[in-house]
Amino acid sequence: MDFNAGVPMSSLSPLMNQDAMWQMNLSSDETMETGSYPERPGEPDCSYYIRTGLCRFGSTCRFNHPRDRELVIATARMRGEYPERIGQPECEYYLKTGTCKFGVTCKFHHPRNKAGIAGRVSLNMLGYPLRSNEVDCAYFLRTGHCKFGGTCKFNHPQPQPTNMMVPTSGQQSYPWSRASFIASPRWQDPSSYASLIMPQGVVPVQGWNPYSGQLGSVSPSGTGNDQNYRNLQQNETIESGSQSQGSFSGYNPGSSVPLGGYYALPRENVFPERPGQPECQFYMKTGDCKFGTVCKFHHPRDRQAPPPDCLLSSIGLPLRPGEPLCVFYTRYGICKFGPSCKFDHPMRVFTYDNTASETDEVVETSTGKSRRLSVSETRQAATTSSGKDTTIDNTQQ
């Protein structure tokens, strides 16, 4: 019995067409699997065939289809050869690095005379590329290294030295380092002035003034104090000159330091100069900038503070009678802002009553030797004595 009996041919025609198409696809797959692709030794390899093992053009493809595809890939990888496909766009990664992770399967053009030509740039001392026409690498400016290495497309300027040795007239050199003020050494000479704390990296040199700029005249009320200060400074200069005989023999943190002036060791300007941008106000005042090379403002090399709008004392600090006292100046006797400080720096903070007996500040130790009280001990003793006086007054009342 015929299974298709009674079934119209019009309903069977779509099914027959689908079967015919399925058989054609099977035959084409068998043809692709059998590897019946043309071998053209003089032509470039078919990139699609090398990558997938198939070719949709079949026997009409004009490229070469080698039988051992894996051998071709391994040989090209060992030789470092990359396909040259004239007419195709150039491989950007190949032009930058000279290599290509896709190898012979890459569909772009790899000209041999341009291998890594885009990556041939000069390197800085850390091995990162210098690209003057590109923007600075922000990550490199912050951390000092770059995870992209030689393939980074941004500029990596030469790093500035953080430490440098500055030779002095003696037998010793002192490394410069940026640090905050420390509590030693102190000025230990017995005089009518408070203790002076020298910052780290600062070497005393005779004849230098702590603050730059022209010194203005002082008020008549401070004439006597200034005269005492100058006499004391001259005496200390003579004493230190007789001991050192004009030579500087190394820096001892525990020894007494003359107040004839100090000179900060010079360093190279590591802050960016941006002529078209506003000036960094903090840098103009202090000569320092916490943002460093990433600061967006201008840092002129020849930094000149604006002329002060008030009178300056003999040590170059502003006298502003109506303003509050500079806390740092009253505590340490110096001011990092110099003539640009907006607070008052009177000379009277350095002096106290000269008629007071100095025996009150000298105590005897257990060994029988006398020693001088420090500033903190003197203040504590004064506080204790004032407390006792208050107690006695309350008892009498």
Swiss-Prot record:
Comp. bias (Polar residues): 364-397
The keyword Zinc-finger is assigned to this record: yes
Molecular function in Gene Ontology: DNA binding; mRNA 5'-UTR binding; mRNA binding; nuclease activity; phytochrome binding; zinc ion binding
Keyword field: DNA-binding, Metal-binding, Nucleus, Repeat, Zinc, Zinc-finger
GO annotation, biological process: negative regulation of translation
GO terms for cellular component: cytosol; nucleus
Pfam families: zf-CCCH (PF00642)
Positions of region (Disordered): 361-397
Keyword NAD included in the entry's annotation: no
Compartment annotation: Nucleus
Protein name: Zinc finger CCCH domain-containing protein 33
Zinc finger (C3H1-type): 40-68, 85-113, 131-159, 274-302, 320-348
Species of origin: Arabidopsis thaliana (Mouse-ear cress)
